[in-house]
Amino acid sequence: MSDTPPDYPTLQSIGWPWPGPPEEAAWQAIFAAHPQALPARVVEQHRTGYVAADTPQASVKAESLPEWQRPRFPSHERAAVGDWVLMEGKRIVALLPRRTSIKRGAAGEHYHQQVIAANIDTVFIVCGLDADFNPRRIERYLLLVGGGGAQPVVVLTKADQTEYAEDALAVLEELEAQNIPLRAVNAKDPDSVAALRPWLGDGRTAVLVGSSGAGKSTLTNTLLGTQKMKTNAVRENDSRGRHTTTHRALIPLPSGACLIDTPGMRELKPTGEEDLAEGGFSDVEALAAQCRFNDCAHIAEPGCAVRAAIDAGELDPERVANYMKLRVEVASAAEKLATRVAQNNRGKGSGKRPASVDRPGRR
């Protein structure tokens, strides 16, 4: 990183949220504690470390904080792509508070949270209109995005295929009812992809999430106007693809926005902090509040407003089944989170190192 004072107009071109120095007290306090450090943004995350940048053209391999190398250090407290950090030379000295994020419960038996991307304005949930089209997976992504501070936009790629058009129309109607934007595009066609421009203005940051083979890397290349990201063909029998993107990376776009491409994620576990109403099920939650019994399971109870809506053809029964499944998963994850918090508090009281716990980030 440069030893000159921060160039805030240039930092704005990679997503810096203010025209000058930070305007939030928490950021100001960290700046004051590190007067010799300069701000930079994490633009790549690898298993072996990070790459950070303070301009769209220049980046350096960054030395992470020593505590981030400890196996039991909470994963959510390590930097993620999109994070803002303070650096002295090539060394990260502080992680600045996140303004928004998208995260998931990490794979495995033990409770951890994984930050997928930080300080983002928009989450593009990418799904192909092919054999991999899965409305239930879209709902799961919407749940993870909800409450994180970023706006979800569902992007259906391979719009030139018509086999799943009827299913897509049903999803469109459900999303429109909740004011969640949906755009169908041909990821290889610049004119078609132009439909995403409203969310890719100067200084904005968006992240692409979705399964392998959904077209995220193809979409990235079209937005860039060049073949920067490697793409692979998908299997014809199930439309699944290999992991083209192997690590998360933030890429400046010609529009002045920044785009974060991510590898396909096979497992999308809730963290226990999700709000079903904010995560794509506001209509179901509103109906559930009208049920006769507060603990209604929406199966066969008398006075169930959710079942009545299903019987009237106003709700998709498969969507309600997914809602109930996700509600159980969120409750289970919330119990694990509470246990971790309790262990953390006991560890602090005893003077022992507390158990790792991923606490909610600042939004």
Swiss-Prot record:
Residues 340-363 are annotated as: Disordered. Residues 112-268 form the CP-type G domain. Its EC number is 3.6.1.-. Its cofactor is Zn(2+). Gene3D superfamilies: P-loop containing nucleotide triphosphate hydrolases, Probable gtpase engc, domain 3. Keywords: Cytoplasm, GTP-binding, Hydrolase, Metal-binding, Nucleotide-binding, Ribosome biogenesis, RNA-binding, rRNA-binding, Zinc. Binds 1 zinc ion per subunit. It holds the Pfam family RsgA_GTPase. GO terms for molecular function: GTP binding; GTPase activity; metal ion binding; rRNA binding. GO terms for cellular component: cytoplasm. Its main location: cytoplasm. This is Small ribosomal subunit biogenesis GTPase RsgA.
